[in-house]
Amino acid sequence: SLLALVCAGVLWAAYDWFQGRYLRAFSSHTAVFSGDPLRLPDEFAGPGPIRLVHFWDPACPCNVGNQQHLTELVEQYASRGVEFYSVQKPGSHGQLPSTLSRLKTITVLPGSEQIPASPAVAIWDRSGKLAYFGPYSEGLTCNSNNSFIEPILQALSEGRTVGATHTLAVGCYCPWQADVK
């Protein structure tokens, strides 16, 4: 009976640790995304291809659902001339899955320290102007059915102008900025 009690205690501790680390309630607060401070680094700025920058935090469980969607975006749009980049949350450690190995890393993107949450995406048009900044979608999950990104990329690919750099959204996001204590 003592062994059963010890086993139950160990199982409870493991469950409690797992729940605290990996299970989170759905975030129902509104995130306000503003692209005003964002600038591409000089080597990528200016006229050129459509550029999509993926902002991610390896410790954020919200990235898992969106990485499959991002893989599909790369498969669909890289052949159409869209270039894909990633910016990892400063001070974090991790790597994207192998399915996203085609994303080029941007170590420092001016203004990225001011973004509110991740996962997030910024898209620059062929003229080098920021066309979109915000989340991939609203809600708990992200896929091509509820994504904001496919319509933006389609419009830009067709030469249409897009100006959606300020977005309010409710979804699964993790804070980007360092906690101030």
In which residue ranges do the predicted regions lie?
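N-terminal targeting signals for export/organelle localization
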Residues: 1-37
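Intrinsically disordered, low-complexity terminal tails/loops enriched in metal-binding residues
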Residues: 27-44, 72-79, 174, 181
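Solvent-exposed coil/turn segments that connect beta secondary-structure elements
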Residues: 58, 89-91, 126-128, 135, ...
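Structural microenvironment flanking redox-active thiols in thiol-disulfide oxidoreductases
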Residues: 64-112
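Short, internal strand/loop/helix patches
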Residues: 97-135
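Short active-site neighborhood of thiol/selenol oxidoreductases, capturing the structured segment around
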Residues: 43-64, 69-70, 84, 153
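Extracytoplasmic
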Residues: 47-48, 79-82, 116-119
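Thiol-/selenol-based redox modules, centered on thioredoxin-like
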Residues: 131, 136-181
